[in-house]
Regions:
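Glycine-rich, phosphate-binding/catalytic loops in enzymes
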Residues: 141-145, 176-178, 231-235, 283-286, ...
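Hydrophobic alpha-helix feature that most strongly marks membrane-spanning transmembrane helices
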Residues: 85, 111, 115, 143, ...
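Signature of N6-adenine DNA methyltransferases within the class I
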Residues: 101, 129, 136, 163, ...
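Short, well-ordered loop/turn elements at secondary-structure boundaries
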Residues: 119-121, 153-157, 187-189, 194, ...
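Proline-centered turn/helix-capping motifs that create local helix->coil transitions or kinks
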Residues: 72, 224-227, 519
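Short, compositionally biased low-complexity segments
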Residues: 37-41, 46-55, 338-353, 430-453, ...
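Class I S-adenosyl-L-methionine
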Residues: 1-163, 167-170, 201, 219, ...
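Polybasic, glycine- and aromatic-enriched phosphate-binding surface used to engage nucleic acids
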Residues: 365-594
Length: 594
């Protein structure tokens, strides 16, 4: 339903927050047959028969009935409110709808063992509350387990913080509607604060919003490249952000921990990248001191958030409950009804710098401690970076003694063979194709002198490679768009965007960046063979690469990838440096020949 409703609002150009709120609330009240006498938040949003938007409301209700023939629930409202957050805001704020099953699991884990007496005055917070889904479920849990009224729970027990005004408003709306469904028609005193949680460590922070017994939620995931400069500056005030380029969710670990009372519990669904990434190194240092009791339920390649390429885990912490072990379990099918089987892993056996290899810990630890790590055994190279592969890389449609022929939308161009090299995309090695079938041609406007690659001068290009020069001129406008138009520092307009991997050692062991089955690496003896989009181990020592090939093609290495590498929902595993660099190559002793 959500996508159809969003398309309808877009088609009607209904972008004003208040108008959208009024439509959603009025529709829900009408479809639920609610009678409101006292709640002024909801009454103030209702569209009556005399309202100019009444016809729009009737049309909107008919759309809902069409798209959603079953009765509309409060969960539908949460989902709708989260869904209509603009795509631009999602990039900046990391707002996303958290499925109810996940919210319920986190809340029950944090509250189920709490004595009823403590629940009577517990303080529970969501410090990045969005539209209030977690807070709504906390309120329901407390009401069902204590008999307290929503009025009392809202005033004394639940607290929300969000940077967006519309999120604060919608949280109050949803909590009001929840109470109305249970016949509590009142004006409520809410503890929902509009503020940037990153300001927690400032003197101006509202002290009502700290010293919590429980914190639950889904901290915002915003990739570091999309984090505003001002926000980055705030993040650097937190110890957990002092490595790599941390994403926005990272500081919420430290903030939530510091906001808790001693013995307080934290339950997050969050990205699992902190377990192994450089960006998570400072977080690992922070938690490995053994001050708190920590459990991680890792979903690995299972995607909890539909249509989102995000990989997550459940993270639980009890503050100042010392433990020298981390509790880790894997759940790769998303079934939250299954009791996790946690493995206890000693912190002093973990390497915070290189990342935590937690899955099947003992087996992986053995593979990472016997021999020479791949990262030290052999140099790896990524491919060239032209920043316009479609200009430089082609499959000839014909050839003769002197030229390859390149077909483009502008016509057919002869390209001098002398300026071309063979190039491959080694990612294609994971498919059932022959090596020869994936060879392409690369226009290589460089000459190699004394181990250095230098661009061929334009005057030489015109004279020696006139046909290639003519073709490149036809692409000049396209080439000028590289690096967002900032190409003035290129040695010439037809130079590649980057100079990486222009010179490679003679021997190359080629393999894909992602694989869904055991590898079959290709070892090539060709100093001029170039690479794009994939990865290769390179060396002038053929025997070294032969040994490495036998290891990478082995079932043992594949089992290591399955246990340790970053998984994807499509069944693929990553072969990036961070995923494989710690796997050890066995030391092979040469026998003495008598």
């Amino acid at each position: 339903m959500n996508s159809q409703i969003f398309a309808y609002l877009k088609r009607k150009q209904l972008t004003d927050t208040r108008t959208v709120n009024r439509l959603f609330v009025s529709s829900f009240v009408s479809l639920s047959d609610l009678k409101i006498e006292n709640n002024h938040i909801i009454k103030g949003l209702l569209i009556d028969k005399d309202d100019k938007d009444f016809d729009l409301l009737q049309e909107f209700i008919s759309k809902i009935r069409h798209f959603h023939p079953t009765p509309m629930t409060i969960e539908d409202m949460i989902s709708l409110f989260e869904f209509v957050v603009s795509p631009a805001d999602r990039i900046v704020t990391g707002a996303v709808y958290t499925p109810r099953s996940v919210r319920k699991k986190i809340i029950e884990t944090c509250l189920n063992t709490m004595p009823n007496e403590q629940m009577q005055h517990v303080r529970v917070a969501d410090i990045a509350c969005g539209c209030g889904g977690f807070l709504m479920d906390v309120a329901l849990f407390l009401r069902n387990n204590t008999g307290r009224t929503f009025c009392d729970i809202y005033q004394e027990s639940i607290y929300g913080i969000d940077v967006q005004e519309y999120s604060v408003e919608r949280t109050k709306i949803l909590l009001s509607l929840l109470a109305l469904l249970y016949n509590e028609d009142l004006d409520f005193d809410f503890n929902i604060l509009q503020a940037d949680t990153l300001d927690f460590n400032t003197a101006e922070w509202n002290q009502t919003y700290t010293h919590f017994d429980v914190i639950v939620g889904n901290p915002p995931y915003v990739c570091s490249r999309n984090v505003d400069a001002i926000i980055k500056e705030k993040m650097l005030q937190y110890e957990v952000c002092l490595s790599g380029h941390p994403d926005l969710y990272i500081p919420f670990f430290q903030i939530a921990t510091e906001m808790l009372n001693d013995g307080g519990k934290l339950g997050f669904i969050t990205m699992n990248s902190f377990i192994r990434s450089v960006n998570g190194r400072a977080v690992r240092n922070y938690f490995s001191r053994g001050i708190h009791d920590i459990s991680i339920l890792d979903f690995r390649g299972y995607q909890i958030f539909q249509k989102k390429s995000t990989y997550t885990c459940l993270f639980f912490l009890t503050k100042n409950q010392a433990s020298d072990t981390l509790h880790y379990a894997v759940n790769e099918n998303g079934d939250l009804n299954v009791t996790p089987k946690y493995t206890n892993i000693l912190y002093d056996q973990l390497d915070n710098k290189k990342g935590w290899s937690l899955n099947d810990f003992d087996a992986v630890r053995q593979m990472e401690s016997t021999g020479i790590p791949i990262g030290k055994y052999c140099q790896s190279r990524h491919g060239i970076a032209t920043l316009s592969n479609k200009t430089y890389i082609f499959k000839p449609v014909a050839e003769d003694d002197n030229y390859y022929y390149l077909e483009s939308k502008d016509g057919r161009y002869p390209i001098e063979k002398a300026i071309c090299r063979n190039v491959i995309n080694s990612n294609k090695l994971n498919s059932e194709v022959s090596f020869e079938s994936i060879i392409e041609k690369l226009i290589f406007p460089y000459c190699i002198n004394e181990g250095r690659a230098t661009i061929i001068e334009e005057s030489v290009m015109k004279t020696i490679f006139p046909y290639t020069y003519t073709y490149l001129l036809s692409q000049r406008k396209q080439l000028a768009t590289r690096d967002k138009g900032k190409t003035d520092k290129y040695p010439t307009w037809y130079a590649y965007g980057r100079t990486q991997s222009l010179i490679m050692p003679r021997y190359k062991l080629l393999f894909p960046k992602f694989a869904n089955k055991p590898l079959h690496c290709v070892l090539k003896d060709d100093a001029d063979l170039m690479l794009y989009n994939g990865v290769a181990f390179v060396s002038d020592d053929l025997e070294k690469l032969q040994v490495l090939k036998s290891v990478l093609d082995s079932d043992l290495f594949w089992s290591y990838l399955v246990k340790n590498a970053k998984p994807y929902s499509t069944g693929y595993y990553s072969l990036s440096g961070v995923d494989i660099k710690n796997f050890c190559i066995p030391t092979i002793k040469k026998r003495n020949v008598p």
